[in-house]
Amino acid sequence: MITPLHRNILARHKSSLNGALRVLPFRSRALGVSRNVFVYEPPNMRNLSDMHLLYLFRGHEREFVYIDEDDSRSTTTIEDLDALISSGQIPPVMAVIPGLTSIDGKRHSMGINSLLPSADTRDGLGSGQFWDFLTLDLIPYVEARYQSKLSGGFRLAAGFSLGGYTTALIATAFPGYLDHAGIYDGLFMFDAQTDIRTNAPDEIWLKSAVPDAALGPAETRSPEALAPWNPAELVRYADPVTMEEIQETMFWIRSAAGDGLEGNHDRCKYFTALLREHGITAGFNRIPLHPDARHTWHWNDRFIKLFLLNVFTG
C-alpha cells in the first residue's frame, strides 16, 4: 500500500530530480505479500539504449529517499545520484530500492530466508523468505522488464549498516551477479560468530535483539544455523568454482571513524582483509571514510557518491 509518506517522498523528488522516482507495488510469490519498491529512472530513460543498474539496501524502502531519515542530510541519496548523472560525472544508472523490514520499519529481515517466519502477514514480512524475494522474484523481474536497456551495463549494489551485510550476502551467496559491491559501515558477521577482538560470541549476531525477526530470539541462535547466511564463511569455505564467481565482484568498503556505538570500523576492516586473503579485489585501501565519519545518512550518502565515481571514473 502506498502511504502518505510515500506520496510526500514522491512529491519532493518530482521537483528536485531531472530523472524520475516511482513506487512499484510488487507482489512477491516468495513472501506471499506485496512490497513497495522505489525505482529511480535516470533522465531521458525512454530514449536510452544502455544504462547501469544499482540496488540500494538498508531497511525500510523510504530510507534512501526520505530527507528526514535523520537530521544529518540536506539531500537524499537519489538526489545525489541524479545530480551525478545530470552533470555528466557518471553514466545513466537506474536504482532499485526494496524494503527489507516490516511496514513500520521495526523488524528487519536482513534479506535472508527467516529462521522464524512471521505469523502475521499484515506486518509486511509475509513468509519471511526475503532471500527468495530478492533472488527469485525481484532481481529476475527487473532483469526481464528492463532487459533491452541493461544488456551492456554494470550490476551494482550498495548498502549501509545492515544493508551492507545484505550487499555482501548478495555478492557471496548469489556469486557472479554483481560487478561492484559498495558497503558503508557494514554490520559484517565474523567467521563462526566469534568476535576476533574478544574471542567471545558475537554480541550483535548471537545475543542482541536486532536480528530477532530473521534469526529468532537469542537463546535459539547458533553459529551453525547462521553459517549459510554468513558472507565471511561463504568466502572462507568457498569451493574453487564458487570462489571464481565471487572474485568477479569488486568490493568497495569504507566505515565510520569509530567502532562500537560509533560505527563498524573493526568489522569492515576484518571483512576487507578476508577478501584480500582470498584474492578478491577491494577497491579502497583506507577503511575509515573520513576522520569525522559517523554512522549517519550524511556520511552514507557521501560514500555512495565516492563509490559511484570510483566505479565509473576511477
Model-predicted regions and their roles:
Residues M1-G314:
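Non-catalytic cap/lid and distal C-terminal segments of serine-dependent acyl enzymes
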